[in-house]
A protein has these predicted regions:
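Cationic, low-complexity basic patches in intrinsically disordered or flexible, solvent-exposed regions
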Residues: 4, 17, 31, 35
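Canonical Radical SAM [4Fe-4S] cluster-binding loop centered on the CxxxCxxC motif
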Residues: 3, 61-98
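Conserved AdoMet/S-adenosylmethionine-binding subsite of the radical SAM
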Residues: 104-116, 126-254, 269, 274
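Auxiliary Fe-S-binding modules of radical SAM enzymes
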Residues: 45-63, 216-297
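Glycine-rich, highly charged phosphate/nucleotide-binding loops
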Residues: 96-106
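Short terminal hydrophobic/aromatic SLiMs and anchors at protein ends
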Residues: 2, 8-23
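Short, Lys/Arg-enriched N-terminal segments with co-localized hydrophobic residues
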Residues: 22-26, 32-47
């Protein structure tokens, strides 16, 4: 009797702990998203700031020698994100930021050496008016070209950035429509907004590229048919090889890890072989003949 009672009590406690853990995980996910994915409207009145700056890059702006600045916060939770510390930057960076005006002063000192600045994240368009104002000041006060990285979830901000004078946009295409939520790590992908941003870029108002980081097991060959249909006729499209930076989101964020496990199981993230990437590329070329691989050894 006592053995059965002990088993029942242990089982009950374990069940309650499991429920409590899942509840706290869900609450934590909601708190993280609320804190680090403020909308452009919610950021109104917050001064533009960056959470890091690379003073020289030969990779971030195609064909240009540039500086790269990193914005904080993101409305996606891609489990393979290589800048996971920026997703929760406002919590993890402890207030250590770089003021936008300081960045502009740096650029003015580097005129004649640097050719441009790449703005990445995180998701830069979450900064809305602050981002647009910063871009406008860079164009007015320096001779630098400006490149913007984005996931395309805020086409209204993208339009304003184009009007402010950006020179190049690199937009991530996470996956096919059916599996976008899996790769984005979030049920609310704002896919209608993503499609709107795709249309803006295809319209030719600014130079651009689309890109997809192929990650095993998140992507399949069929996904590249879907991606091709989304951006058919694009000027440039790159399939990028996944590389573990040591700062990927799934290893630092319980909510992202839980979402990835529920979506694709427990398989570890990894890179596809060159042959596998070539097969994806062949599919993409049916829709974008100029498609290329990037970052393949």
């Amino acid at each position: 009797f006592y053995q059965s009672l002990s088993y029942f009590i242990s089982y009950h406690i374990l069940s309650q702990l499991t429920i409590s853990y899942r509840t706290s995980l869900k609450m934590r996910e909601e708190q993280i998203l609320k804190r680090s994915a403020l909308s452009p409207r919610e950021r109104k009145g917050i001064h533009m700031k960056f959470y890091g700056m690379q003073k020289l890059s030969l990779l971030d702006f195609p064909g240009k020698m540039c500086a790269t600045v990193f914005t904080g916060g993101c409305n996606y939770r891609c489990p393979f994100c290589h800048n996971s510390s920026l997703v929760e930057a406002e919590r993890l960076c402890g207030g250590q930021t770089i003021d936008g005006e300081e960045v502009i002063r740096f650029l003015r000192r580097r005129e004649g050496i640097l050719e441009g600045i790449a703005i990445t994240g995180g998701e830069p368009t979450l900064w809305g008016e602050q981002l647009v104002s910063f871009i406008r000041k860079v164009k007015e006060q320096t001779d630098m070209l400006v490149k913007l990285d984005t996931n395309g979830t805020h086409p209204d901000v993208l339009r304003e950035c184009i009007a402010a004078g950006i020179d190049y946009v690199a937009m991530d295409i996470k996956s096919s429509e059916e599996r976008y939520h899996i790769v984005a790590g979030h049920a609310d992908t704002r896919l209608d907004k993503v499609k709107e941003s795709i249309s803006i870029l295809l319209g030719g108002e600014v130079d651009y590229e689309f890109r997809t980081t192929a990650v095993k097991p998140l992507h399949t060959a069929e996904d590249f048919n879907g991606i091709g249909q989304l951006i058919s006729g694009a000027k440039r499209y790159f399939i990028q090889c996944y590389k573990d930076s040591g700062d990927i989101l799934i290893e630092s964020d319980e909510a992202a890890a839980e979402y990835e496990r529920s979506a694709v199981g427990t398989a570890e993230l990894g890179a596809y072989s060159k042959d596998e990437l070539e097969s994806f590329l062949a599919i993409a070329k049916k829709y974008i003949p100029t498609a290329e691989l990037r970052g393949v050894d």
